[in-house]
Amino acid sequence: MPDRAQAALLPDEFPGPVDGRIYVGTCSWAEKSFVKSGFYPPGVRRPEDRLRYYTTQFPTVEIDASYFALLPPAYSRRWAEQTPPGFVMHAKAFGLFTGHAASVQRLPPGFAALLPDRLRESEEVRFSDVPEEFLNACWDHFRAFLDPLALTGKLGYVLFQLPPGVKYSPEALEAMLVWKQELAGRRLAVEFRNRDWAAHPEALDFLAQERLIYVMVDLPDLPRLMPAVEAMTDDWAVVRFHGRNRAGWARAGATTEQRYDYDYTADELRPWAEMAGRMAGSGRFFAMFNNHVRGNMASNARVFQTLVEGREEPGSTP
C-alpha cells in the first residue's frame, strides 16, 4: 500500500468515459520516456502506484508490453486488482502472431525447448519458422494472460497490428480467421499500416462480416502509410494517434522516438472529436494516443477529452 505522502497523490476519482461511450486514453502507462515525461507526480514511483494514478486521469489504456513478450497471468491479475470497476485495458497481441519477430530471450521458461535446435540460439524467431507445438503453447499462454482481465470485465479489445510491409491478400484475411478462432469470445481489433489496404474496400467488408474491429489511424500523409479512413465495422470504433511527424516516418532507420515525436494541436484533433460523437452511437469509441515522446500522448489525450466534452481548449483556433 502507498504511504501517506503517496496516498495524497493518488486520488480515488475515476474519470469514466465521456457520455458513457467515448473513452480517451494512451497506448501505454509504463513506457520509459513517458514515465520520465513528468506525467506522474514526483512521489508516484512504484509501478502499482503509477497505474493507480493513471486511472485517475483516463478511463482506458493499452497494454503494450504484451506485444513484446508473453506476459504471465500474474501480471494481468494484479492489474485487474489495481484498477477500479469500469476501467478498460486493451491488450496488444504478441508480435509473433502478426508476423513480427519475437525475441527468444524473452520467451517464457521452457518455450525455447519447443523450438528446433537451429532456432534456440537465435536472437529472434518469426511465425513462419516456428513449429505448431510452439505456436499452440504461445496461444495458450496468451489466452491465460487475457483471462483475469476478461473475468473482471476489464478487457477491452485485443489489438492485432499488422507489419508495415503486409499488404492486402487472401492469406492475410485467413490469418485473421485464425486469430478469431484462437481467441473466440474476445473482441479483436485489426490495424493496417500499409496504404495498399485502403485500395481494397472489401477488406472492411470482411472485418464487418467477421465482427472484427477496424482500427482507424492518424499517421503522416506519406505514400506507403495507411491513410485516415473513417469506417466502423463493429459497435466499437477505435482510432490510434501515432503523430504526424513526416520527417521521422519518412526517414529510413528512424528510431521510435524520432517517429512518434509529435504534439497535436486542438485543430488537428477537432475533426476526430466530432467523428467520435457521430460514431459512438449505442456502442463505444476509443481514442488512443501513441505519441509517447515527452508525454505528448497524455497532454493530447486531455485536449481531445475537452473537445469531446464540448469544452474548447484554451489557445486553440476558433
Model-derived features with residue positions:
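Residues lining hydrophobic/aromatic ligand-binding pockets adjacent to catalytic sites
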Residues: M1-P318
